Amino acid sequence: MARIAGVNIPTAKRVPIALTYIHGIGDFVAGQICDAVGIDRARRVNELSDAEVLSIREYIDANVTVEGDLRRETSMNIKRLMDLGCYRGLRHRRGLPVRGQRTHTNARTRKGPAKAIAGKKK
């Protein structure tokens, strides 16, 4: 297994698919990386030489925010919104949907499991 950005990527898969195992790299960015480094998208990871893996690793380190740095940046952005006290920050703090979705029904993913209310019947 090749190790890129602290992640063991699968060797049997094609390079763009294997790169998506890294947090912060999706299909589009994986294709961009292959094009920038000059690796054919149809090649598999086990066919790459050490120099090619190194060039992918260097490109990702220089140009893409991934893994821990990306997670830290995202959490700091949410924390900043919460500290500002803006509407989005309040929604994050209360554990409610942030982007205007309805909450009268649904929103169970964000709100958690339904809580029983004593004395309420249908």
Curated annotation (Swiss-Prot):
UniProtKB keywords: Ribonucleoprotein, Ribosomal protein, RNA-binding, rRNA-binding, tRNA-binding
Any one Gene Ontology molecular-function term assigned to this protein's record: tRNA binding
Domain of life: Bacteria
BP terms from Gene Ontology: translation
Region Disordered: start-end pairs: 99-122
Pfam entry (one): Ribosomal_S13
Cited InterPro entries: Rbsml_uS13_C, Ribosomal_uS13, Ribosomal_uS13-like_H2TH, Ribosomal_uS13_bac-type, Ribosomal_uS13_CS
This protein's record includes keyword RNA-binding: yes
Subunit structure: Part of the 30S ribosomal subunit. Forms a loose heterodimer with protein S19. Forms two bridges to the 50S subunit in the 70S ribosome.
HAMAP family in the cross-refs: Ribosomal_uS13
NCBIfam families from the UniProt entry: uS13_bact
Family (UniProt): Belongs to the universal ribosomal protein uS13 family.
Functional description taken from the UniProt entry: Located at the top of the head of the 30S subunit, it contacts several helices of the 16S rRNA. In the 70S ribosome it contacts the 23S rRNA (bridge B1a) and protein L5 of the 50S subunit (bridge B1b), connecting the 2 subunits; these bridges are implicated in subunit movement. Contacts the tRNAs in the A and P-sites.
Name of this chain's protein: Small ribosomal subunit protein uS13
Source organism (scientific name): Cereibacter sphaeroides (strain ATCC 17023 / DSM 158 / JCM 6121 / CCUG 31486 / LMG 2827 / NBRC 12203 / NCIMB 8253 / ATH 2.4.1.) (Rhodobacter sphaeroides)
